[in-house]
Amino acid sequence: MNGGDEVVAASADPSLPLEWRFSQVFGERSAGEEVQEVDIISAIEFDNSGNHLATGDRGGRVVLFERTDTNNSSGTRRELEEADYPLRHPEFRYKTEFQSHDPEFDYLKSLEIEEKINKIRWCQTANGALFLLSTNDKTIKFWKVQDKKIKKICDMNSDPSRTVGNGTVASSSNSNITNSCLVNGGVSEVNNSLCNDFSLPAGGISSLRLPVVVTSHESSPVARCRRVYAHAHDYHINSISNNSDGETFISADDLRINLWNLEISNQSFNIVDVKPAKMEDLSEVITSAEFHPTHCNMLAYSSSKGSIRLIDLRQSALCDSHSKLFEEPEQAGPKSFFTEIIASVSDIKFAKEGRYLLSRDYMTLKLWDINMDAGPVATFQVHEYLKPKLCDLYENDSIFDKFECCISGNGLRAATGSYSNLFRVFGVAPGSTETATLEASRNPMRRHVPIPSRPSRALSSITRVVSRGSESPGVDGNTNALDYTTKLLHLAWHPNENSIACAAANSLYMYYA
């Protein structure tokens, strides 16, 4: 983010509702085009600078994008201060991609391990190189992506561009092929032995030259796997999170959380273990885990019962006890079969400064203050209109969908996904009534329906809970119109700007305000 951007951001009133605009789309599919399962995006993450974006898909690939407009702002300081709109269009471009994970088979457990990327987390950059962690269900990998100078092999004895038949070398010239080169040390596809397609020039080859390797001024990003962290989880990994110390990270599965050092791949420490002595006594599982953004000794993890636990690594080596427990006060009245299912927390995110914590369950988005454990300080209704349809959602397994959430860098807004490729943006600042429903398409406001707010209700004498977005009978005004097969599960908020990247199947949509 450059100086011009900071001036524009400062001049805008953060309390005013944002007007979201379409920015870019990558991998947009045409009407009626079938989406391949391996192309569906399963993870999205901005780096700390916001200049790079990574996506992972079900095919085990990681695709990197880089920002191209960071130095394009123009105008005097006065013009920037007087502007009440963003002066530039945020733009990213494709940088590179690599195969992070491949399908595997666990012969001991007779279990297939999918290549699908579950999570991506960026690490600190060093010496112009990018570092990131990616994980599937069982294995975490540490990647280094760095621009390398392209090397070319020049002054070949035969011209790889002049071929006959199946592509074998056909001619040689001492004068015309001096500049013929093969990039990055590659070789043209020639047969190991002479065949009918190969012909020598008239008079034969007068002399042989030694090819020369030349380093050009061009560069190309190259991804290398630096370390593999494996064989530490018996259950599927659902979370990885970097520590603010830049040296360690955690990985979490259904029953355990492990602490790793980035430099050591053959050893980890189990810091949370919720596995009971008898599995029939199991009452809840870990659903998400996240390090505190500034305190390297603190982390939070959520459970399938709707609770969030804050733990302090300084208390003990095995953090079976928590320092704080955040959960919704138990509601009076009968409970249904679906009560515990819809209470399960699918994702948690710390705000940038670390005081507030955002959580998403099936029905709501909640904001918590880590200094107050009496209950959430705000609750935002996302799927309230689906309550009458819980039986149908259970039958088609949609009730188990895990929607992610994200919070803006300034902590004033939060976003989460829904069905029919819709996502919701809420103002989470005290007193804010901002809500917006957008569609992951080139026209994000096409299906926008204003959603009235509901007054705050008191939770206790200490805190008040704001509940909004619950009065609408449905995002579309008709729940039958919702398409439960098109769901927006993954999205990320730019760390410094009001810009959101979200995944609709195999397409990556980006919006700005």
UniProtKB/Swiss-Prot annotation:
N-acetylmethionine: modified positions = 1
**Molecular function GO labels:** protein phosphatase regulator activity
What is the top-level taxon of the source organism?
Answer: Eukaryota
For this protein, the record's InterPro entries field holds:
PP2A_PR55 (IPR000009), PP2A_PR55_CS (IPR018067), WD40/YVTN_repeat-like_dom_sf (IPR015943), WD40_repeat_dom_sf (IPR036322), WD40_rpt (IPR001680)
Q: What is the tissue specificity?
A: Expressed ubiquitously.
Q: Name one GO cellular component term.
A: protein phosphatase type 2A complex
- Check the UniProt entry and state the signal peptide residues, or none: none
PROSITE patterns membership: PR55_1, PR55_2, WD_REPEATS_1
Q: Which UniProt keywords apply?
A: Acetylation, Repeat, WD repeat
Q: Which regions are annotated as WD repeats?
A: 36-75, 112-153, 232-270, 281-321, 340-378, 483-513
One Pfam annotation reads: WD40
User: Subunit comment for this entry?
Assistant: PP2A consists of a common heteromeric enzyme, composed of a catalytic subunit (subunits C), a constant regulatory subunit (subunit A), and a variety of regulatory subunits such as subunits B (the R2/B/PR55/B55, R3/B''/PR72/PR130/PR59 and R5/B'/B56 families). Interacts with SIC/RON3.
Q: What does the UniProt record say this protein does?
A: The B regulatory subunit may modulate substrate selectivity and catalytic activity, and may also direct the localization of the catalytic enzyme to a particular subcellular compartment.
Identify its protein family.
Answer: Belongs to the phosphatase 2A regulatory subunit B family.
Full protein name: Serine/threonine protein phosphatase 2A 55 kDa regulatory subunit B alpha isoform
